[in-house]
UniProtKB/Swiss-Prot annotation:
UniProt membrane topology term: Single-pass membrane protein
GO cellular component, one term: thylakoid membrane
Regions crossing the membrane: 17-37
Subcellular location: Plastid membrane
UniProt main location, coarse: plastid
Name the record gives this protein: Photosystem II reaction center protein L
Function: One of the components of the core complex of photosystem II (PSII). PSII is a light-driven water:plastoquinone oxidoreductase that uses light energy to abstract electrons from H(2)O, generating O(2) and a proton gradient subsequently used for ATP formation. It consists of a core antenna complex that captures photons, and an electron transfer chain that converts photonic excitation into a charge separation. This subunit is found at the monomer-monomer interface and is required for correct PSII assembly and/or dimerization.
Keyword Transmembrane in record: yes
Domain of life according to the entry: Eukaryota
Family per record: Belongs to the PsbL family.
Keywords: Membrane, Photosynthesis, Photosystem II, Plastid, Reaction center, Transmembrane, Transmembrane helix
Pfam family, one: PsbL
Gene source species: Aneura mirabilis
InterPro entries listed in its UniProt record: PSII_PsbL, PSII_PsbL_sf
Length: 38
């Protein structure tokens, strides 16, 4: 219970993966919109 490092690392990794997921969804949305509007 006196080891905040692993918990902090886990939260940081989760936040990073969430940002990568949002970026991937954004890129896919842009590519699909370009495909449909052309």
């Amino acid at each position: 219970m006196t080891q905040p490092n692993p918990n902090k690392q886990s939260v940081e990794l989760n936040r990073t993966s969430l940002y990568w997921g949002l970026l991937l969804i954004f890129v896919l949305a842009v590519s699909f919109s370009n495909y449909f509007f052309n």
